[in-house]
């Protein structure tokens, strides 16, 4: 039996509203990275956590602490979500930190099938992430009305 955890990109989940629905669908259907498990092997999803965010000097340490929340419940493999695979320039650093801190846990990069190329995905995410938006400052300065 494989006991899995998924780490999602906090920018994708918190700022862009990703609900991990594609990751979970492919987990259930054994597609994408989950297709690497034998059909006869039972898969259990122990939990999903978000990355602590784009790093400062403590980024890898913060991620290691978050992963402890899964290791305490017997996770044996951590999957970095497709968002991390396609978007994160720090994924290899994070992967190394987890492998060093948890040598008995396998770290895999990827979850669901790729629906577009990673480059196209990055461009599309950048477009929605960088849209101008209104903030509380606009309300305070009375700039929140259209026109």
How would you label these PLM feature ranges?
Residues 3, 76-77:
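Structural motif
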